[in-house]
């Protein structure tokens, strides 16, 4: 840098200081600047003190580095503070550096309080920021204050100004704990540059002040000396290299299939040939893909690029209007989809040809083994499009980013090196296909010999740790949000974790640091997935530090002018240069030209010859250079936000919102907000409304009119409902605002723009519970501390209502004050499982009696409160009490069972009856080849303390009596006996041999029903238990208890015993109560033509066994779940009603649907018994379901489903009666039960643990309850079992298990189709209010079933 005679620094060396010995002070480093003698005359010309020139220079620096128009700093003038005084003389100053004004203009008005003013401490911003860590010390005599003495740790930087007629001087001191030496050095240089600008160009406009100097240029020349060359290849060529090198290596390991590289190559080549020959796919042809997580999605992607086209992923969960907009904007001519997504594609774009991809389609296709035979077009090259990805667009239309082969190849080459993806990597593919991260996962792996591991959609949502372990994943790229849902102990084989897609959180980093090779990565989709990485994340690195560029160069430019570089350390817009920058937005030159530079910036030439075909993309992200050139992320310069990893343009949401509002509101705005005490952000829509709230943010004047009148609230709630319905048609769920607030007017800045900061600030001052009341019909608006003056007076509530509201809040995850006495439990999201939790919490925490039946009968809070009664405490049962009176003398009974079990008398801890289902299961095992044994094979962590682990298992074995339970035959019934004994371990040499032999070992009377094994190499634990002593909830508690004991976490006290449970469900008689008999006679009263599957009896001695299975993900169409809640119905009711409709269509007796009867397995935990939800024991119950279909064809779905739910509620008091005792009531009841051929099981998602495979176990579970293929043949005694596992959002996972001697796979697939159709029609009718229309009747002769057994006796039902 050249210096004129007006400004000639002579000394700017940095001087280290000695360390401070005082705890409250921090060590100091400093640098000095000698100012020119002309400083005084220059200041005198403006009639201001010389110190004002220094202050202006520092203000210009702060404005540049912090991107704020009115920086502030503190000053101390030693004229007003004697030596040795404290800092009470500290004063704060600020300067308004408005664009359009010159430096000279500012200096001339230095004393104008609208330009330069003083602030009191209460006018300072509430949060401490870099603007407040600066102090200017005005010293009257050089040497009076030592600039290297330790400084207050609250101050990051102190500038000492020493005025002098001959040689004025500055010393800059900084706290190295707050400001790095490198950053301080650049601050010093920038201050020199700012002062030089003041002296040399006082007429320059503030906006044109450029503090980028020669020192910054030299530093960037060092950091950005290298720009990677493009990888000029096709991505399929890189893939072919791997195929040639390792054809047998695993390429894809998915939940629905595995492929090695040779197989993947051949399948994708075959499909590519079809795309070329049958559909005319050539270069630049865009092919849309619509797949769930599947191996076939990978085949389809590779096939499209091999054929020369570019693929575009469409999310099957997005609304049809979104699909149509994407297809229109990209001019896609073909859809590839799966069988599951076919209906979605046909509904969304019926005019677009589609091809369903599945395994069978390849059998008849020619085998194009060599890629050369597939790609016939000679025009395909690296600059042709490889894929298109759509992101949110501010104009309401998605932006379609076109990425070329050269960009993709350049990106995956850099990504694989930076993320250490090698042939030994097993890479998790978690991200949605519409999220560009998925493309990085897939192609970085497939071009470097790694294996892509793909969990199912259900596993992604509910059992990710289990999927990671089952698939052998050792490397993953996840958002912080998702990574925080896992723990290192759950996934011990995961060795490399990269955080990306959203800013990393310190909590997530702390969890994973030192447990895995942890990296942090950044990249907009326009830069082909990733372009910046922090390769070694540690606790000492700031979460904002995203590292250095990979495959590109990163520059920081002025946010409003990319032809100006920002000084080192200053905040600016991140500009990416390199071959991985995309081509642009498809058919959108306006938006392309706005962010993709047509010409290199003018400063580029000063850094040497530009690289070939280099491209530039303005990210819109704000960043600055940190130590060593690392990039520090600082946020956005526009309205683009990220929510749960999804990129959202607020402008697009606002565009759709305005469309939906039409004439209902003149204006609206959408913002990402963080309500007070809320752990997660959400999208909030602010809608102008005549009776809306006032957003006046003056501290002394809290907002008024916060509570709408009941009438206004009702009208606004109606408007919000219309908005939600309309926006669901055009936007994906993650882009729909989760909160709507009526405002009298939108706040504006002084320049007349929307004041988004004011909107965000308003929400930070109020709780989500309070904000939610504006769109809630509940007139009892809650307060939230800061908003007491808003709330309308609460209605008088009874103590029972108040207590119940608190319990609802705990169960439903809401604030207590957001629940009103007229709210509906089911409408607030409650279901059968939530009702069970509510009942147990009421008994345990409030000593109130409430039943699940009560919850469903009276879901409104006020009505429900009228039903609660004080809890009658369960009496503690003494051992053996349930066996007396009427049995043998206890001493004789104990002697009898001790002899049978081969133990001493005092080892018999307790004896009690069996549940009806326990009896059924055990007798079924004893009568045939169905062992009913369940196995859990657990892979133990390598660093597991084995003795400690064995000790934890032993303690849990003693803690839960059910693990020490045996069955003994006593007279004509089975009883269960708890034995005091120690846990014994088997130590097999071979895991495989043991598991196979153990699975075949049948249970026996008088013997233990659990087996525990640890392989000789201590790598696997095998827990085997008979199904009569555990259920899914119990298994989760058992494994969770082992984990807790191992980690020295105290176990909660036992709240209820199995004996107490049995005392409530057993009458200790051979028959049922009169009430039970009356209920079942009425409930199962036969009607003409009623039954289950109407199939012929081929052999009365044959016992069905469900030994095969198929599965499918079923989603509810948009609006179904809210409609269910509005009608007080549950998803389980819809599932049950749809199955009834499916069975009704198979009736052959008449055109009028008949009644249907089928079996079900229920949790059995609906008793009002405190702690029953945590009971470690089998509480399942087996019962018949009867649904009268004769009137259904004339009913509206809401009425039909309400009847189904009412019947289920009425059954609750009798659900433990047991199938055998129900069948024995009389001949008519038995005849109806004999018609049951199918079993429907609805699995809820339990709180905390969904199954053993998701338990927080010290090691992953390789196989568990969900590995149904092995266990179904032992457990299912029906010919057809339908198991539906509810998902947290919008659907369920259905598995049909069947006897392959009775059903063909085609039959079952058709039944699944019929079932899906019934769900669709019922759900659609529910939202539209139509009558029930059963699917087209299917006659028996259209099925190809070989026959089905109708059991004729109780023994056949067991």
Swiss-Prot record:
One of its GO terms (biological process) is secondary metabolite biosynthetic process. Pathway: Antifungal biosynthesis. Its EC number is 6.3.2.-. Residues 261-659 are annotated as: Adenylation. SMART domains: PKS_PP (SM00823). Pfam families: AMP-binding (PF00501), Condensation (PF00668), PP-binding (PF00550). It is an enzyme of class 6 (ligase). The modification O-(pantetheine 4'-phosphoryl)serine is found at residue 832. NCBIfam families: AA-adenyl-dom (TIGR01733). Nonribosomal peptide synthetase; part of the gene cluster that mediates the biosynthesis of the tetrahydropyranyl antifungal agent restricticin that acts as an inhibitor of CYP51 and blocks the ergosterol biosynthesis. Within the pathway, rstn8 catalyzes the C3 esterification of restrictinol with glycine to yield restricticin. Rstn8 represents an example of the emerging class of single-module NRPS-like enzymes that perform esterification reactions. Rstn8 displays strict substrate specificity toward glycine as no other natural amino acid is accepted. Belongs to the NRP synthetase family. This is Nonribosomal peptide synthetase rstn8. It comes from Aspergillus nomiae NRRL (strain ATCC 15546 / NRRL 13137 / CBS 260.88 / M93). The lineage of its organism: Eukaryota, Fungi, Dikarya, Ascomycota, Pezizomycotina. The gene is rstn8.
């Amino acid at each position: 840098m050249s210096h004129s005679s007006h400004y000639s620094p002579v000394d700017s060396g940095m001087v280290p200081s000695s360390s401070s010995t005082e705890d409250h002070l921090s060590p100091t480093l400093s640098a000095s600047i000698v100012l020119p003698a002309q400083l005084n005359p220059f200041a005198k010309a403006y009639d201001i003190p010389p110190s004002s020139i220094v202050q202006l220079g520092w203000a210009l620096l702060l404005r540049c580095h912090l991107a704020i128009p009115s920086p502030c700093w503190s000053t101390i003038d030693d004229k007003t503070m004697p030596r040795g005084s404290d800092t009470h003389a500290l004063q704060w100053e600020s300067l308004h550096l408005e664009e359009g004004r010159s430096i000279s203009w500012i200096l001339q008005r230095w004393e104008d309080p609208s330009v330069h003013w003083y602030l009191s401490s209460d006018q300072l911003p509430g949060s401490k920021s870099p603007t407040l860590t600066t102090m200017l010390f005005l010293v009257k005599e050089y040497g009076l204050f030592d600039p290297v003495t330790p400084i207050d740790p609250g101050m990051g930087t102190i500038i000492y100004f020493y005025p002098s007629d001959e040689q004025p001087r500055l010393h800059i001191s900084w706290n190295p704990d707050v400001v790095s030496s490198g950053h301080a050095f650049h601050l010093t240089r920038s201050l020199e540059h700012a002062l030089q600008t003041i002296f040399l160009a006082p007429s320059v406009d503030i906006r044109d002040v450029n503090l980028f100097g020669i020192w910054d240029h030299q530093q960037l020349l060092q950091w950005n000396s290298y720009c990677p060359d493009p990888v000029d290849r096709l991505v399929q060529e890189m893939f072919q290299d791997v195929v040639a090198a390792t054809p047998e290596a695993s390429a894809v390991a998915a939940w629905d299939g595995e492929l090695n590289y040779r197989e993947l190559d051949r399948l994708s080549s075959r499909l590519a040939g079809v795309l070329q020959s049958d559909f005319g796919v050539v270069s630049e042809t865009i092919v849309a893909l619509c797949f769930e997580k599947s191996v076939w999605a990978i085949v389809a992607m590779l096939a499209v690029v091999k054929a020369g086209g570019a693929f575009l992923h469409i999310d099957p969960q997005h609304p049809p209007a979104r699909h149509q907009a994407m297809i229109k904007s990209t001019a896609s001519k073909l859809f590839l989809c799966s069988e599951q997504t076919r209906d979605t594609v046909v509904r969304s774009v019926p005019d677009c040809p589609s091809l369903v991809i599945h395994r069978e389609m390849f059998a008849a296709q020619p085998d194009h083994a060599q890629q050369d035979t597939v790609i016939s077009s000679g025009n395909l090259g690296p600059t042709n499009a490889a894929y298109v990805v759509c992101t949110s667009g501010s104009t309401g239309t998605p932006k379609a980013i076109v990425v070329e082969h050269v960009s993709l190849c350049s990106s995956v080459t850099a990504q694989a090196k930076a993320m250490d993806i090698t042939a030994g990597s097993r890479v998790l593919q978690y991200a949605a296909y519409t999220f560009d991260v998925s493309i990085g996962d897939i192609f970085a792996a497939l071009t470097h010999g790694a294996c892509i591991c793909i969990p199912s959609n259900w596993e992604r949502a509910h059992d990710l740790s289990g999927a990671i372990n089952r698939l052998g994943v050792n490397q993953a790229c996840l958002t912080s949000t998702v990574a925080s849902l896992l723990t290192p102990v759950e996934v011990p084989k995961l060795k490399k974790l990269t955080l990306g897609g959203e800013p990393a959180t310190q909590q997530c980093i702390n969890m994973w640091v030192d447990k895995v090779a942890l990296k942090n990565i950044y990249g907009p989709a326009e830069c082909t997935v990733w372009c910046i990485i922090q390769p070694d994340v540690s606790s000492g690195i700031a979460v904002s530090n995203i590292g250095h560029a990979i495959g590109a160069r990163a520059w920081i430019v002025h946010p409003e002018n990319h032809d100006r570089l920002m000084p080192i350390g200053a905040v600016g817009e991140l500009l990416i240069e390199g071959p991985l920058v995309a081509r642009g937005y498809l058919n959108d030159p306006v938006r392309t030209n706005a962010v993709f530079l047509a010409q290199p910036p003018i400063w580029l030439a000063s850094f040497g010859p530009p690289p070939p075909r280099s491209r530039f993309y303005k990210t819109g992200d704000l960043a600055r250079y940190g130590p060593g050139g690392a990039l520090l992320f600082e946020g956005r310069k526009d309205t683009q936000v990220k929510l749960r990893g999804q990129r959202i343009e607020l402008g697009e949401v606002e565009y759709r919102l305005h469309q939906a509002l039409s004439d209902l509101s003149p204006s609206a705005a959408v913002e990402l907000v963080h309500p007070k005490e809320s752990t997660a952000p959400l999208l909030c829509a602010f809608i102008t409304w005549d009776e809306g709230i006032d957003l006046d943010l003056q501290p002394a004047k809290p907002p008024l009119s916060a509570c709408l009148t009941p009438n206004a609230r009702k009208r606004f709630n109606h408007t919000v409902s219309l908005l939600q319905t309309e926006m669901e048609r055009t936007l994906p769920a993650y882009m729909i605002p989760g909160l709507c607030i009526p405002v009298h007017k939108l706040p504006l800045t002084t320049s007349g723009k929307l004041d988004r900061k004011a909107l965000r600030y308003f929400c930070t001052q109020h709780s989500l519970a309070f904000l939610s009341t504006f769109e809630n019909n509940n007139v009892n608006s809650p307060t939230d501390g800061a908003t007491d003056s808003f709330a309308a007076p609460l209605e008088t509530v009874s103590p029972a209502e108040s207590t119940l509201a608190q319990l609802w809040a705990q169960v439903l995850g809401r604030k207590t004050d957001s629940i009103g006495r007229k709210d509906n439990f089911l409408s607030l999201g409650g279901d059968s499982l939530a009702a069970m939790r509510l009942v147990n919490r009421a008994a345990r925490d409030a000593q109130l009696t409430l039943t699940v039946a009560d919850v469903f009968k009276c879901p409104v809070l006020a009505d429900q409160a009228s039903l609660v009664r004080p809890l009658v405490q369960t009496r503690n049962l003494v051992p053996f009490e349930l066996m007396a009176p009427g049995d043998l003398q206890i001493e004789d009974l104990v002697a009898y069972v001790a002899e049978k079990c081969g133990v001493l008398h005092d080892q018999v801890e307790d004896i009690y009856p069996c549940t009806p289902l326990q009896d059924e299961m055990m007798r079924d095992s004893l009568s045939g080849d169905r062992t009913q044994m369940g196995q859990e094979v657990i892979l133990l962590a390598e660093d597991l303390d084995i003795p400690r682990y064995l000790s934890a298992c032993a303690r849990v074995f003693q803690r839960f009596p059910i693990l020490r339970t045996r069955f003994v035959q006593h007279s004509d019934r089975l009883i269960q006996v708890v034995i005091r004994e120690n846990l014994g371990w088997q130590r097999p040499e071979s895991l495989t041999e043991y598991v196979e032999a153990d699975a075949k070992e049948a249970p026996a009377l008088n013997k233990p029903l659990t087996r525990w094994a640890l392989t000789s190499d201590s790598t696997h634990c095998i827990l085997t238990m008979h199904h009569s002593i555990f259920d899914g909830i119990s298994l989760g508690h058992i494994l969770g208890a082992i984990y807790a004991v191992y980690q020295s976490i105290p176990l909660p006290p036992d709240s209820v015993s199995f004996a107490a449970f049995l005392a409530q469900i057993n009458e200790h008689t051979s028959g049922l109560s009169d009430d039970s008999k009356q209920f079942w006679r009425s409930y199962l009263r036969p009607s003409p033509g009623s039954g289950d599957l109407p199939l012929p009896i081929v052999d009365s001695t044959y016992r069905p066994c469900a030994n095969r299975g198929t599965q499918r993900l079923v989603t509810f169409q948009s609006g179904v779940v809210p409609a269910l809640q509005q009608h007080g119905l549950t998803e389980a009711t819809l599932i049950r009603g749809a199955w009834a409709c499916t069975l009704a269509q198979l009736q052959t007796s008449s055109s009028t649907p008949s009644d249907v009867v089928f079996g079900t397995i229920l949790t059995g935990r609906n008793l009002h018994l405190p702690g029953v939800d945590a009971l470690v024991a089998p509480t399942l119950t087996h019962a018949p379901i009867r649904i009268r279909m004769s009137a259904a064809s004339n009913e509206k779905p809401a009425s039909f489903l309400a009847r189904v739910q009412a019947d289920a509620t009425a059954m609750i008091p009798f659900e433990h009666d047991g199938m055998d005792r129900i069948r024995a009531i009389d001949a008519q009841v038995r005849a109806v039960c004999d018609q049951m051929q199918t079993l429907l099981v609805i699995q809820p998602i339990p709180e905390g643990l969904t199954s053993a495979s998701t338990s927080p176990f010290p090691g992953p579970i390789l196989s568990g309850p969900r590995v149904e293929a092995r266990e179904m043949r032992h457990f299912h005694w029906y010919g057809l079992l339908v198991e539906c596992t509810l998902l947290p959002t919008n659907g369920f996972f259905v598995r049909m298990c069947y006897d392959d001697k009775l059903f063909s796979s085609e039959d079952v697939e058709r039944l699944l189709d019929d079932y899906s159709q019934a769900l669709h029609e019922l759900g659609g009718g529910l939202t539209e209010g139509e009558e029930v229309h059963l699917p087209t009747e299917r006659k028996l002769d259209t099925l190809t079933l070989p026959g089905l057994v109708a059991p004729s006796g109780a023994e056949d039902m067991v």
